[in-house]
């Protein structure tokens, strides 16, 4: 379940966009990004590799197509899939449903269904701005029809908190810090609230993410480790 929440947070926010987007998302076809996820003890748990494989005009904006692969700490492939994001008039929009298909590990006997809103990163973001909320529903069932998982998550109180310097294995970046609250209601597994932060660097996108519980204890994080432009 923790892996699902980490992937959810990642794919909700980390999509790459073209030159027509705002300065924080001015990326290009062929760009490769590697991020490593860590547990609450800062031990590596997985590596996510993403590449911008296509970009094309659509409905007055730009569509970005992304290939992503998730590996465990031994380098074994856990999941792979393709996602997309769009940029229009400087706004970047990612469909939360991008997390569907093969991005969450599952077996052939399990059917996964994801429905949700679009996550918006407006043009000209600055400290003090409030950003639109979003919601997502994840359900999984066995081929027999038996329900396994039902998760309803809301992403609220999104705001641009501050400007901060972030050091990563891929370099040092001046970042816009965005915070939000993720409330996940999970049937049979109980509810969970996470206070999340993400750090956006100009021309790179997200370089760091942190997730904390309601008491302020770190639960997981992700950090940029490699960048190829």
Model segments located where?
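Bacterial Sec-dependent N-terminal signal peptides
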Residues: 1-21
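Acidic, serine/threonine-rich low-complexity disordered tracts
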Residues: 19-82, 140-229
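Solvent-exposed helix/loop surface patches that form functional interfaces
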Residues: 28, 96, 100-173
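Hydrophobic/aromatic-rich structural module bridging two neighboring secondary-structure elements via a short loop
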Residues: 68-100, 107
């Amino acid at each position: 379940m923790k892996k699902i929440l980490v992937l959810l947070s990642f794919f909700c926010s980390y999509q790459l966009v073209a030159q027509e987007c705002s300065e924080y998302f001015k990326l290009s076809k062929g760009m490769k990004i590697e991020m490593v996820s860590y547990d609450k003890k800062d031990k590596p748990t997985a590596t996510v590799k993403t590449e911008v494989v296509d970009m094309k005009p659509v409905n007055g904006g730009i569509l970005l197509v992304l290939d992503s692969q998730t590996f465990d700490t031994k380098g074994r492939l856990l999941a792979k899939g393709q996602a997309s994001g769009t940029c229009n008039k400087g706004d970047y929009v990612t469909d939360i449903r991008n997390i569907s298909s093969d991005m969450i590990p599952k077996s052939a006997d399990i059917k996964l269904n994801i429905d949700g809103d679009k996550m918006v990163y407006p043009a000209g973001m600055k400290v003090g701005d409030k950003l639109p909320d979003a919601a997502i529903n994840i359900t999984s069932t066995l081929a027999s029809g038996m329900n396994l998982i039902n998760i309803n998550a809301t992403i609220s109180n999104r705001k641009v908190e501050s400007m901060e310097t972030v050091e990563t294995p891929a370099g040092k970046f001046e970042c816009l810090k965005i915070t939000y609250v993720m409330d996940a209601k999970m049937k049979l597994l109980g509810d969970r609230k996470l206070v999340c932060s993400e750090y956006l660097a100009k021309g790179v996108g997200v370089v760091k993410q942190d997730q904390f519980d309601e008491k302020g204890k770190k639960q997981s994080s992700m950090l940029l480790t490699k960048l190829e432009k």
